Amino acid sequence: MSANASALAGAVLAGGESRRMGRDKARLRLRGETLAQRQVRVLREAGAEPVVIVRRAEQRMSVRAVEQVCDEFVGAGPLAGVQAALKAAAAAGARWIAVLAVDMPAIEAAWFGDLRRACRKGKGAVVRHADGFEPLAAIYPINALATAERRLRRGERSMQRFVAALVRQRKMRVVALPEEERWRVANWNRPEDRDRERRKHA
């Protein structure tokens, strides 16, 4: 069975501390909407419902009609965000969750359409390129929750190792990303990244 709209939840990971950017990335604006609003829209256009935002407890953001959840494993990085997303999706009765980092504004709904077509027999899907997996724009099966929690309790935070473990467990399928498509997974880390993207759409 492939992932379908009724079985697919979504989560925007917005809990990073944005040290290099100097301000909360989730509240940066691009083409009239905040990055948090944009990523929620992209996930919904991809057929994900419900969509949640995973954030730090002290963060405040205004995105209408979207549940916000906080990291359970505080300070444990993106893996803690994925764990919180998986837990929320499991509570909603979803079989898969599409996860998208708030600072990847080149990802469009079609990205998840391609991944959904790879989700067979309950497996999730992740893109891999020359530098490794792209774990923050991926579809995870809900049964990845136990693996995430087990690794976090052991103090392990590596997203690359987490995804590699899921691939070994045959819970994730790998989709190759051509080198000429690498621009799609660029993220905003510094103010110059934001400014460069804004100039494209000026």
Curated annotation (Swiss-Prot):
GO cellular component: cytoplasm
Gene3D superfamilies in the cross-refs: Spore Coat Polysaccharide Biosynthesis Protein SpsA, Chain A (3.90.550.10)
UniProt keywords, alphabetically: Cytoplasm, GTP-binding, Magnesium, Metal-binding, Molybdenum cofactor biosynthesis, Nucleotide-binding, Transferase
Record: residues binding GTP: L13, A14, G15, K25, D71, D103
GO biological process, any: Mo-molybdopterin cofactor biosynthetic process
Catalytic activity: Mo-molybdopterin + GTP + H(+) = Mo-molybdopterin guanine dinucleotide + diphosphate
InterPro entries: MobA-like_NTP_Trfase (IPR025877), Molybde_CF_guanTrfase (IPR013482), Nucleotide-diphossugar_trans (IPR029044)
One Pfam short name: NTP_transf_3
UniProt family annotation: Belongs to the MobA family.
Entry comment, domain topic: The N-terminal domain determines nucleotide recognition and specific binding, while the C-terminal domain determines the specific binding to the target protein.
Descriptive protein name: Probable molybdenum cofactor guanylyltransferase
Organism: Opitutus terrae (strain DSM 11246 / JCM 15787 / PB90-1)
Name of the gene this protein is made from: mobA
